[in-house]
């Protein structure tokens, strides 16, 4: 991302993430990921959380830094150097967190968003289900929910 469009704070966050990429994730670890010797890079996820680098655009009251989308995008760009596995893990609290932040109750934000940004809760999303020609038509996705006891089966 170009420095001339970024504020000092956004540059500082980008540089923090860049430093994390260079100093906290070894090439040996990345090779282990490539060889499928790591099921989920939880160690990296927790280190990012310890450094308050997850969901930097969310308000501080929920564990973010109260920064901007520009800072978030710059951080994602830097993390992307580590490959898609870690990039997806990094982006998930932001993607899932956005739905909780925008549409969740205060109770849900405290129950899910805060622990996500602290690295104590791992989030995920499902884009498609088997149907027709498959693919990843995010806006065309349909879902059914069936109640079984106290739970819903999606």
Outline where the language-model segments fall.
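Intrinsic disorder at enzyme termini
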Residues: 1-14
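An alpha-helix initiation/capping motif
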Residues: 11, 15, 35-42, 65, ...
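N-terminal glycine-rich anion-binding loops that anchor highly charged ligand groups
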Residues: 16-24, 43-51
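C-terminal helix-coil-helix/basic helical segment that borders enzyme active sites and/or dimer interfaces
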Residues: 26-36
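Short coil/turn segments at secondary-structure boundaries
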Residues: 33-34, 60, 126-129
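Internal helix-loop-helix
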Residues: 50-122
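Glycine-rich, Trp-frequent "lid" loop and neighboring beta-strands that shape
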Residues: 64-65, 107-154
């Amino acid at each position: 991302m170009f420095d001339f469009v970024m504020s000092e704070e956004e540059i500082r966050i980008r540089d923090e993430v860049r430093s994390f990429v260079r100093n906290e994730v070894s090439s040996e670890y990345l090779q282990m990921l490539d060889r499928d010797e790591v099921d989920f890079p939880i160690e990296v996820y927790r280190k990012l959380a310890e450094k308050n680098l997850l969901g930097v655009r969310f308000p501080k009251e929920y564990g973010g830094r109260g920064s901007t989308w520009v800072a978030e995008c710059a951080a994602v760009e830097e993390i992307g150097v580590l490959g898609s596995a870690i990039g997806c893990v990094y982006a998930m609290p932001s993607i899932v967190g956005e739905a909780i932040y925008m549409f969740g109750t205060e109770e849900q934000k405290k129950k899910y968003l805060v622990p996500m940004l602290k690295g104590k809760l791992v989030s995920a999303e499902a884009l498609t289900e088997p149907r027709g020609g498959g693919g990843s038509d995010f806006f065309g996705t349909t879902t059914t929910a069936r109640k079984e006891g106290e739970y819903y089966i999606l």
